[in-house]
């Protein structure tokens, strides 16, 4: 375990857990009410998410894996030799492993980092890797947020001047509103691609499926309910780390709600009360959730061709390559900064 821990670099600019209660309070004090995504990615939350995302009906993961297994050799051709490759969100490396194996086969000198908020999940991820297979690809991990990772690439001697390739798998960009997705990509580009724009890129996945039945089956698959409710236990821990005082949330008061928003082209995930008014506890006991009120915690935007081009263009990026396989709604795109 000591060897594994030595591979993990702490790049946190602040302890993100400290800010989550403030984000929870702010989100529940507005209309419509929301909960921050960070609340859902505790160690327990991530384990439930992995169970959910590996369910048979959760097509995004299965389609990503099909594409990566079929097209990884082509995809690594787009990654420059001597690159630093960062997976911005590595709850599981099963999707990245085909890419690492293809990079090793190409004999490119690559330094790969898995980035995650959870130290324990990074430990688990690194323990599962077959290091003996890799001679050209060096493997490590970064403990921090997306923002920490991008800043680390920009500022770190010995890293900042090398080509960068950032992986945004798992439909990560779809979790942001369309304007915020463009800003997110623009921030990555200006900080992590600008030093070597010709050789640096983003590899991301997007989903074009707008068939309500397929989407709803996926996002109500096994594991999603415990994933959603684990956030409430995590919230209780953050508001009362010593387990003293009244709980903010009673998980037994809540249902998970899954909806397709046809007008906005997105899936919406919310928590609702079990048909009754709920007053929160502890420091949030002045907040009341009405019986028909939704607390949204996640959206997954789907992108058709026109929406993709608006997204990339608004971020100052251009898609230079695309990879998919027949029958898949998911595709991977290589993005680079637009020439001046």
From Swiss-Prot:
Reaction(s) catalysed by this chain's protein: 4-(3-methylbut-2-enyl)-L-tryptophan + S-adenosyl-L-methionine = 4-(3-methylbut-2-enyl)-L-abrine + S-adenosyl-L-homocysteine + H(+)
Any one GO BP annotation for this protein: methylation
GO molecular function, a single term: methyltransferase activity
Enzyme Commission number(s) from the entry: 2.1.1.261
Residues making up the signal peptide according to the UniProt record: none
Domain of life, source organism: Eukaryota
Main EC class the enzyme belongs to: transferase
Pathway participation: Alkaloid biosynthesis; ergot alkaloid biosynthesis
Keyword Methyltransferase: yes
Disulfide bonds listed in the record: none
Keyword Methyltransferase included in the entry's annotation: yes
Keywords annotated in UniProt: Alkaloid metabolism, Methyltransferase, Transferase
Quaternary assembly: Homodimer.
Classification via PANTHER family: ERGOTHIONEINE BIOSYNTHESIS PROTEIN 1
Reported function: 4-dimethylallyltryptophan N-methyltransferase; part of the gene cluster that mediates the biosynthesis of isofumigaclavines, fungal ergot alkaloids. The tryptophan dimethylallyltransferase ifgA catalyzes the first step of ergot alkaloid biosynthesis by condensing dimethylallyl diphosphate (DMAP) and tryptophan to form 4-dimethylallyl-L-tryptophan. The second step is catalyzed by the methyltransferase ifgB that methylates 4-dimethylallyl-L-tryptophan in the presence of S-adenosyl-L-methionine, resulting in the formation of N-methyl-dimethylallyl-L-tryptophan.
Family (UniProt): Belongs to the methyltransferase superfamily.
UniProt-recorded name of the protein: 4-dimethylallyltryptophan N-methyltransferase ifgB
Organism: Penicillium roqueforti (strain FM164)
Organism taxonomic ancestry: Eukaryota, Fungi, Dikarya, Ascomycota, Pezizomycotina
